[in-house]
């Protein structure tokens, strides 16, 4: 999936997450995580984000994640909404994801 434009999904409310994405000129993934529960769940948050990016074959992006204790399912949903917005497609290609 090609990320064409910057996008934002989520809120800064307790129990939610705000994620910002922007395309990069390289194929790297620049991941910045700021979380109120990073000491306990930082590795799980990072793993979830990288799993979703790999599932949709996303490379060459900068991600800024401001987590306020979001559950894994909320993190995945916000990230999938973000990918759809940033790629300019109306819906995610569910049948193509791995």
From Swiss-Prot:
GO terms for biological process: acetyl-CoA metabolic process; citrate metabolic process. Covalent carrier of the coenzyme of citrate lyase. HAMAP family: CitD (MF_00805). GO terms for cellular component: ATP-independent citrate lyase complex; cytoplasm. It is found in: Cytoplasm. Keywords: Cytoplasm, Phosphoprotein. The modification O-(phosphoribosyl dephospho-coenzyme A)serine is found at residue 14. This is Citrate lyase acyl carrier protein. Oligomer with a subunit composition of (alpha,beta,gamma)6. Belongs to the CitD family. It comes from Escherichia coli (strain K12). One of its GO terms (molecular function) is prosthetic group binding. It comes from the Bacteria. Induction: Repressed by H-NS. Part of the citCDEFXG operon. InterPro entries: CitD, Mal_deCO2ase/Cit_lyase_ACP.
């Amino acid at each position: 999936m090609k990320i064409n434009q910057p996008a934002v999904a989520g809120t800064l409310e307790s129990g939610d997450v705000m994620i910002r994405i922007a395309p990069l000129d390289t194929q790297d993934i620049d991941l910045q995580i700021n979380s109120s529960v990073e000491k306990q769940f930082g590795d799980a948050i990072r793993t979830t984000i990288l799993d979703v990016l790999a599932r949709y074959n996303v490379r060459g992006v900068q991600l800024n994640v401001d987590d306020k204790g979001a559950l894994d399912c909320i993190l995945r949903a916000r990230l999938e909404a973000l990918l759809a917005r940033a790629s300019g497609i109306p819906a995610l290609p569910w049948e193509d994801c791995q």
